[in-house]
Regions:
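RNA/tRNA-interacting regions in translation and RNA-turnover enzymes
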Residues: 1-188
Length: 188
């Protein structure tokens, strides 16, 4: 065959769709797809972890283990972690209250309020990084939370403050048999 009809998901360029990709008339025959779509080359490592190693279920966690293994072989590697000095635990200027119903199950809940965010498509580099680890990009806000989750291993969630009833977030376990709407808009 001299060609192929495919969707963006079949060549790692987007979420699963029912349609096919139609290239513009200026697409040159023989040009590698990575050049046409400006896809950067990357190496993806698939790592199997045992359930007791949740500390290693992130990019930084894997890097920490890799550093320890290489340093034991004579290397002198150091980790450079981002500064968190601006995220003081003493900052109480949020207008949102947090109530933890079971502190034995959730001893700490923290949040940051960021204002004047324009929800839009993520930049291409972020979309490609998420797609490379099997996550479909949604928008800049959701994509940043997913990126940080995989970077540091800490689950995040973004809330629209105008949608929080009573300016209060309540952390609790679900009651037996209760249902709720998940982020994919399904009742579970």
């Amino acid at each position: 065959s001299n060609g192929m009809i495919c969707g963006p998901d079949e060549i790692g360029l987007g979420p699963k769709t029912d349609g096919i990709m139609v290239l513009s008339n200026d697409a040159k025959v023989g040009l590698p797809g990575s050049e046409y779509f400006d896809v950067k080359s990357d190496v993806i490592f698939e790592i199997g972890l045992t359930p007791n190693r949740t500390d290693a279920m992130s990019h930084i966690g894997v890097a920490r283990d890799l550093k320890a293994a290489l340093n034991s072989k004579g290397h002198n590697l150091k980790m450079c972690l981002p500064s968190i000095k601006d995220f003081s635990i003493d900052n109480k200027h949020l207008n949102i209250d947090v109530e933890i119903k079971s502190p034995d199950l959730c001893p700490r809940y923290s949040g940051v309020c960021i204002s004047n965010i324009k929800v839009q498509d993520s930049p291409e580099w972020l979309k490609h990084r998420l797609l490379s680890i099997g996550i479909n990009p949604t928008n800049n806000v959701v994509d940043v939370t997913n990126y940080v989750l995989h970077e540091i291993g800490q689950p995040l969630h973004a809330f629209d403050t105008s949608m929080i009833e009573g300016n209060k977030i309540i952390i609790k376990t679900a009651k037996e048999g209760s249902t709720f709407i998940t982020l994919d808009e399904n009742e579970r």
